[in-house]
């Protein structure tokens, strides 16, 4: 989903952009408020959640099961959406997008950390509402809040993940 580059893609209409952004915001709000029903309502039944590193989860039921298990290991979390865009898909009811996020969290064991990442998304309009058909998490940093762990978005690592990087 990282190629072609966004500059070569046609943006969705303003109305679709706003509705997709509402989907993104509803997702982040559900993470913050630990609301699995709300979080699950963001996905199509046959969606795919790609967490990178070969961790691919298929189907809404399996995605929800993993999310509940993951949230069980986190005592508190705030997910923030920073910026993003959405582009026309192969039909009027399909689109793709990219959204930068960060998470600040405290794990159940008391450790705290941050995640800096972006999602490459695919959406479908179902009964007039945009939903995720795929979310591919591209982690750029995951570790202590002091940023002492390694970043994973240097040029070589981006290229290895199939992301166009020319500087």
Q: What positions do the PLM features span?
A:
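Short, cysteine-centered beta-strand-loop-beta hairpins and adjacent loop/turn segments enriched
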Residues: 103-113, 142-143
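Short beta-strand edge/turn micro-motifs at domain boundaries
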Residues: 2, 94-96, 118-149
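A solvent-exposed, acidic/Ser-Thr-rich amphipathic alpha-helical stretch
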Residues: 36-101
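Short, surface-exposed coil-to-beta transition loops
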Residues: 79-81, 114-119
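Charge-dense, low-complexity intrinsically disordered segments
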Residues: 10, 14, 54-57, 110
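Acidic/histidine-enriched, glycine/proline-rich intrinsically disordered or flexible terminal extensions
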Residues: 143-167
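Short, low-complexity N-terminal intrinsically disordered segments enriched in polar/charged residues
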Residues: 1-33, 37-41, 45
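Short beta-strand segments enriched in hydrophobic/aromatic residues
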Residues: 31, 43, 101-103, 136-139
């Amino acid at each position: 989903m990282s190629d072609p580059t966004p500059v070569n893609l046609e943006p969705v209409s303003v109305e679709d952009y706003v509705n997709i952004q509402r989907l993104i915001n509803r997702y982040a709000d559900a993470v913050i408020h630990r609301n699995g029903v709300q979080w699950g309502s963001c996905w199509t039944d046959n969606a795919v959640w790609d967490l990178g590193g070969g961790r691919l989860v298929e189907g809404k039921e399996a995605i929800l099961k993993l999310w509940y298990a993951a949230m069980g290991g986190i005592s508190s979390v705030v997910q923030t959406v920073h910026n993003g865009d959405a582009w026309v898909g192969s039909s009027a009811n399909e689109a793709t997008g990219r959204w930068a996020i960060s998470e600040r969290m405290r794990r159940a064991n008391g450790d705290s950390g941050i995640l800096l990442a972006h999602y490459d998304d695919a959406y479908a309009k179902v009964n007039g509402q945009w939903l995720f058909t795929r979310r591919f998490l591209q982690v750029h940093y995951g570790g202590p809040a002091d940023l002492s762990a390694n970043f994973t978005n240097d040029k070589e690592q981006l290229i290895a993940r199939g992301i166009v990087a020319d500087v």
